[in-house]
A protein has these predicted regions:
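Adenosine-nucleotide cofactor-binding segment
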Residues: 1-57
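C-terminal hydrophobic helical "lid"/dimerization subdomain
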Residues: 7, 56-60, 100-153
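Glycine-rich phosphate-binding loop and adjacent beta-alpha segment
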Residues: 51-112, 150-153
Length: 153
């Protein structure tokens, strides 16, 4: 299950195999979670954008004794009553980097073409236009998923 506020990202998630998606601009995540999990919540919630609202959404929608993994690098302060973590006996993990093995496995996956990673590439720039690529990303209106900078032929 994938939640987002951008339809294009939800469509991309479906292309990669997500069996359920919810646009939280149009539907309450809590309502969707209750319907999807029969009121139990999710065993694992992965917060990938770093926004306080999405972290709080993970806490609210995690199952009893659920796991929350934070990979989004947030810059804003998050305030909440921590007793919900205790009452639900949640496990919260932070992850900033990957292991060398993870990079090797991902390189092998891309090389095998088992997963078409190019579906998520919105634009390709040559190295000499790398500054334009970073500007496009800095001014992203939500339509860009990933940008690829091509080095060499």
């Amino acid at each position: 299950m994938v939640a987002d506020i951008l339809d294009n990202r939800l469509e991309l998630a479906k292309e990669y195999g997500a069996t359920a998606v919810v646009n939280t601009k149009n539907q309450s995540l809590e309502d969707f979670t209750n319907e999807f999990t029969n009121g139990k919540g999710f065993d694992v919630c992965i917060e990938a954008c770093g926004a306080p609202e999405t972290f709080l959404g993970c806490i609210e929608n995690a199952a009893f004794a659920g796991n929350i993994v934070l990979i989004g690098n947030g810059k804003r302060e998050t305030s909440f009553v921590h007793s919900i973590i205790l009452k639900k006996e949640l496990n919260i993990f932070g992850s900033r980097n990957a292991l060398k093995e993870d990079f090797i496995n991902n390189i092998d996956l891309v090389a095998s073409k088992e997963c078409d990673v190019m579906k998520m590439v919105s634009r390709v720039y040559d190295m000499e236009n790398a500054l334009d690529a970073f500007k496009a990303l800095a001014n992203n209106d939500g339509t860009l998923a990933k940008i690829l900078i091509k080095i060499g032929d």
